[in-house]
Amino acid sequence: MNFKTPIQALSPGSTPTKIEMCPAARANGKIWIDLDNSPHVPFFVPIIEELQKRNYSVVVTARDCFQVRELADFFHLNYKLIGHHSGKGKLRKVAGLCFRALQLIPTILREKPDLAVSHCSRSQLIASTLCKVQSFFLGDYEFATPWVFIYPTWHMRPEVIPERTLPRSPSRNLKYPGIKEDVYVPRFVPDPSIRSQLGLQEQDVVVTMRPPAREAHYHNPQSDELFEAAVEFLCKRPELKIVVLPRNEKQAMWLRDRWPELFSNGKMRIPEKVVDGLNLIWHSDFVISGGGTMNREAASLNVPVYSIFRGKIGAVDQYLSKTGRLVLLHNAEDLQTKILPGRRERPSRPQDGHSAALSSIVEQMVATMESQHVRSGGMEVATERGTVGR
């Protein structure tokens, strides 16, 4: 089977609009966006659209790892595939980051971008620093440091992350309202056919599960133990059906080998083809995930969600936990006392909302491009949410 992990589409049930790179001749400047991980694709799709509406040329590169390529193809992005996942282990990761940075340099020399933009792409940060291209680095996990002694020109993060956790001066630290997922979740439109596509009955209580990211630098083996304990806890409830979203084919094979009886009796299933992750979350009764993006997507959709992530808890997840939108599970006992495995009352569609996060991020990028810093190192420019400058 050609396994693909489900994706987070913005408008399920319809073909995404093709997003082209703007031509080289440009009125307002050129922005280079690097897609380093799968969640970055749906995040940047509306940003690219907004930048192109403002007549900015956008060049897109992507790393061939996890589901980045599949997602970029789904959204019909015009991108150049550069580099791949380097595997587990600190030395291999560092070597892989540096090697991909070198692979990105020809794109910089050819395209001559005015600004390098990413969501935590360390390879892009290294390459742009070496080529003296100013960088706009977005991040929502304060414990993921950019690089030792290499910092972006501007760093933008959700406003719930405290200023004191960031390495740069206040004039270089920008912020936006809400969380990263608020950039694209407000555009989501539900497609009710998802349950029948997965062979689920309307009366089934559905839990969507996302295993921990074993290859991530922040991975804690306790997350794996908690995931297995959660499956054992849930499989004892006859009304529950478990939909699992593995991160890759290797993880899918491990799941089938670990719980063959649950797959054979239909208790647990992996989607056979690409499905819309947001749509699956919306039509689930609750979510249990070791991945931050799926947790926050569920929180944005007001779907009950339980986190089995056992790394350092960042400010965004702490904020969601304090506001009752995310439940943090610390041990197997929490499975018994905190999870409420029942049907939820699901409205016909999510609550409508305007993405203040999207407009804030785009306006800051535009202010950066309009300033003299990007192309000639000129004076500071004041923006509505702060000052962009040296």
Predicted segments with their positions:
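A nucleotide-sugar donor-handling region in carbohydrate enzymes
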Residues: 10, 19, 156-223
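A short, glycine/small-residue-rich beta-strand->loop->alpha-helix junction that serves as a flexible
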Residues: 33-45, 216-218
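Conserved nucleotide-sugar phosphate-binding/catalytic loop shared by glycosyltransferases and other
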Residues: 35, 52-96
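Catalytic donor nucleotide-activated moiety binding site of glycosyltransferases and closely related
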Residues: 75-87, 232-271
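Donor nucleotide-activated moiety binding/catalytic core segment of transferases
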Residues: 100-104, 249-290
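Conserved nucleotide-diphosphate donor binding/catalytic pocket of glycan-assembly enzymes
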Residues: 114, 119-182
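A donor-sugar binding/catalytic signature common to diverse glycosyltransferases
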Residues: 115-122, 127, 137-138, 279-316
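Leloir-type glycosyltransferase catalytic cores
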Residues: 170-201, 323-390
